[in-house]
C-alpha cells in the first residue's frame, strides 16, 4: 500500500513521537536533502542529488532514509503567493505519489513559498560567491524547509495541539 501523502500536521500524526525526518527541496535538476535529529529539533544538510531518472533519484532518497533511520519525509510544496498551485506544485505532488509507491513512510507536504529566495538572500548576506551559492542552495533550501516544519511542529506541541 502506498505511503500516505498529507499536509504536514496530518502527516505528523502518523509519524512516531521520535525519529528523524528527511526534508526535500525538489527542483527540476536537483533535489536538496536535509535530515533532522531524532528529537526533531535541528535540520542538517545531507546532499544535493543531481536528478537523472525517477528510479535513480528515489533509490538514493530511500537509501538515505534507511541509512539515517528516518520515520517520514517532509516535501516542500511550491505554492504560489496567492495560495494557488501551479505546474511546479503539480509536479511535486506527482513526485510524492511516485515516491509513496516505493515506501511506507508518511510524506508530509509543507509550504515552501520563498524558501529558495530566503536562502539566496542569506547566502548573499554571508558574502558567498555566486558559484558557491549555486553548489549549496538546494541543500540549504531543504534545511530551510525542514527547519520550518520542525519549528511549526514544536510550536504545536508546546501549545498542546
From Swiss-Prot:
Family matches, as InterPro entries: RNaseH-like_sf, YqgF, YqgF/RNaseH-like_dom, YqgF/RNaseH-like_dom_sf
A Pfam family recorded for this sequence: RuvX
A biological process from GO: rRNA 5'-end processing
Subcellular location per the Swiss-Prot or TrEMBL entry: Cytoplasm
NCBIfam families: RNAse_H_YqgF
HAMAP family in alphabetical order: Nuclease_YqgF
Function description: Could be a nuclease involved in processing of the 5'-end of pre-16S rRNA.
The protein's name: Putative pre-16S rRNA nuclease
